[in-house]
């Protein structure tokens, strides 16, 4: 039973023109629900590239997503549209949005299959309506991609609501790493298939972190050792799904293989410094066929169970 729910904007800035007129923008939009008998720490959900809070809501085939699954497990849930996305589309930059005919590209890159064919055993319902819903949950960025703007808003949210657990996905991964540096209220991070801007100590960037992604950016970044050590202060768990090829014949798929390998290196470096980072490749723990969106795949209950178990082992439930 829901005890309280609501929505609000958080973070952002106010521009003022030469005549004193104002423009409020670059804030995040937050929808939250608190169950009766809520557990100690709420879960804050961050979406990835081309997405908004719909990622965590009803799945494309109509089942309950992580929003309801964890609400039923008595966690307060905060679903966020980051600045310049979805319900937080009031960005402070001038921008022109044109249709990009790229849905088949995302079908591949999100590892549903190789267009128009689905992967054998993929945890995705194979019907036209599900695929239609899947494509319609994509939304543009109203401005440039700016991890500082995004993380400022998430940090403002944690400062507002107090201690919680940050659940991130894809591009939300590096946003999470950035946000951790700006607030003391993140008790742990669980990240699904993070990609981009992986922080390594200056002078210790591994070769695996130097590859250029399909977004034409180097996967790793260098930070001072004092910053790197911040990631040893909270437990972190990272999950990757299935259908990760061993060769680069399909670069849009192999990119995720390289990311999994890199995050294992990152985890070891942090753990060697006293950190608590776990990287889980879902097929290795018996979950097969997962796409880039484990939280909405057909086996999302089992995926959620893994997270619940981890939260319990870290005394976060």
Question: Where are these predicted regions, by residue range?
Answer:
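A conserved short beta-strand
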Residues: 184-200
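Gly/Ala-rich beta-loop-alpha elbow adjacent to hydrolase catalytic centers
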Residues: 167-176
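Catalytic active-site module of serine/aspartate enzymes centered on a nucleophile-bearing elbow/loop
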Residues: 289, 293-317
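Short beta-strand element of the alpha/beta-hydrolase
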Residues: 40-49
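N-terminal cap/lid segment of alpha/beta-hydrolase-fold proteins
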Residues: 1-38
């Amino acid at each position: 039973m829901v005890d309280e729910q609501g929505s609000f904007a958080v973070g952002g800035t106010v521009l003022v023109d030469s005549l004193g007129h104002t423009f409020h923008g670059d804030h995040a939009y937050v929808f939250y629900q608190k169950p009766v008998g809520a557990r100690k720490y709420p879960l804050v959900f961050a979406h990835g590239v081309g997405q908004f809070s719909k990622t965590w809501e009803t799945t494309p085939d109509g089942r309950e997503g992580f929003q309801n699954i964890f609400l039923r497990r008595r966690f307060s849930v905060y679903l966020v549209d980051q600045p310049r996305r979805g319900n937080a589309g009031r960005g402070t930059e001038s921008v022109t949005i044109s249709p990009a005919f790229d849905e088949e590209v995302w079908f591949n890159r999100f590892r549903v299959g190789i267009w128009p064919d689905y992967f054998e055993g993929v945890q995705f319902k194979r019907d036209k309506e599900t695929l239609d819903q899947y494509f319609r949950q994509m939304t543009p960025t109203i401005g440039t991609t700016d991890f500082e703007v995004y993380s400022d808003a998430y940090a403002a949210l944690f400062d507002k609501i107090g201690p919680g657990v940050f659940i991130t996905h894809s591009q939300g991964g590096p946003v999470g790493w950035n946000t951790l540096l700006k607030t003391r209220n993140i008790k742990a991070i669980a990240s699904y298939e993070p990609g981009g801007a992986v922080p390594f100590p200056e002078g210790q960037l591994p070769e695996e972190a130097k590859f250029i992604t399909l977004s034409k950016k180097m996967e790793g970044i260098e930070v001072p050792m004092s910053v790197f050590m911040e990631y040893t202060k909270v437990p972190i768990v990272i999950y990757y799904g299935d259908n990760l090829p061993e060769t680069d014949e399909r670069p849009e798929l192999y990119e995720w293989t390289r990311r999994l390998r890199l995050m294992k290196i990152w985890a070891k470096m942090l753990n060697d410094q006293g950190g608590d980072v776990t990287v889980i490749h879902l097929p290795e723990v018996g979950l097969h066929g997962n796409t880039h969106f484990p939280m909405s795949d057909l086996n999302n209950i089992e995926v959620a169970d893994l997270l619940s178990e981890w939260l319990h082992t870290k005394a976060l439930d």
